[in-house]
Amino acid sequence: MAISGVIGEMGAIGLIGLIGLIGVTARHPIQAPMPTRPEAFFLPSDAAVGGQRFCLYHPPAVTPARGFVVYVHPFAEEMNKSRRMAALQSRAFAAAGFAVLQIDLLGCGDSSGDFGDATWAAWVQDIVQGCRWVLAEAALNSDDAAQAPLWLWGLRAGCLLAVEAAAQVDTAVNLLLWQPPASGKPLLQQFLRLKMAGDLLGGQAKGITETLRQQLADGHRVEIAGYSLSAAVAMGLDGAKLTNAPGVPAKKIRRIEWLEVSTREDASLSPISATTIAQWQSAGTTVRNQVINGPAFWQTTEIEEAPLLLAASVNAISEQEAQ
């Protein structure tokens, strides 16, 4: 999507007046917040691949900022499907007093490179650099920046990247996870099946998933749904797990807000989500979870919104940690 398209999404934020500061508790009074204008820029990359990363920075509506948020977008076409929700949520966070950075990772959106040039490790490095940038920007504007929490906010595969990046960030972080998978393996399998679905029309689907996996294992790129998938990204996604990295203290990730959406009124966490949460809790990390009514906007045919998720997310990161 061109820069004009991204900023165009920014302009149609009719929900912000509705959700405003819904749920922000009296313990966090915000004095007459004024709408902020997002700032688009290119961040020179520190990664070996180099180039620039397109960023959109949302200044907080109040100073000092109540916290800092770095958004980690999902994988492939899910990124495009979720752009509107990411824009709405970023503006809502900024209105609630949080500084927000949206960054297009290597080969994605308006950043340098092609999707096929990306590696999982380079994506993690992009996120780490984004965190350093937003904290440095905050330090320029407030002496209290070090006291405010840093949040990594991921969606789907972005949750897996956020967990890996958290281990490399210079400070302790909190995680806001939207529809987090327990591992990347099913996400890769789902993506490979897009190729199988296309080949079904030509009668060539037999064994296609196994063939694609072998090509990736041999270090080759594969073309799926208009994306050139590199072996480095595929293997990184396939091996990613939503667990703390070995050797990283549990206190490095202080708190996790785990939010899922479902169109079912009686929806609850899946067994694998419950198990993953229990593993984090047993390691000493505070985890709170909610299942919220709303559509799977990252995969719907038409662009959709989940207003209840927007409000729940503002509430979640606005809560003070237990002392």
Please place each PLM-identified region on the residue numbering:
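Active-site signature of alpha/beta-hydrolase-fold catalytic machinery across serine-
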Residues: 164-168
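Gly/Ala-rich beta-loop-alpha elbow adjacent to hydrolase catalytic centers
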Residues: 151-162, 179
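Short beta-to-alpha linker loops that shape the active-site pocket of alpha/beta-hydrolase fold enzymes
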Residues: 75, 99-109, 181, 293-295
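N-terminal cap/lid segment of alpha/beta-hydrolase-fold proteins
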Residues: 32-67
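The alpha/beta-hydrolase serine catalytic core
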Residues: 169-283, 287-314
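Small-residue-biased low-complexity repeat regions
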Residues: 1-26
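Catalytic nucleophile-loop/oxyanion-hole region of alpha/beta-hydrolase
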Residues: 108-141, 146
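Short, surface-exposed "cap/lid" segments of acyl-processing enzymes
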Residues: 60-104
